[in-house]
């Protein structure tokens, strides 16, 4: 994915680490 900053804090951490 590669959201970066998402609405969900927990999801944000995962998206931030798995930026793709």
Curated annotation (Swiss-Prot):
One of its GO terms (molecular function) is aspartic-type endopeptidase activity. The keyword Glycoprotein applies. N-glycosylated. One of its GO terms (cellular component) is extracellular region. Disulfide bonds: none annotated. Keywords: Aspartyl protease, Glycoprotein, Hydrolase, Protease, Secreted. Its EC number is 3.4.23.-. It is found in: Secreted. One of its GO terms (biological process) is proteolysis. Expressed in chorionic epithelium (trophectoderm). Belongs to the peptidase A1 family. This is Pregnancy-associated glycoprotein 75. It comes from Bubalus bubalis (Domestic water buffalo).
């Amino acid at each position: 994915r590669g959201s970066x900053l998402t609405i969900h804090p927990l999801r944000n951490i995962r998206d931030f680490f798995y930026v793709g």
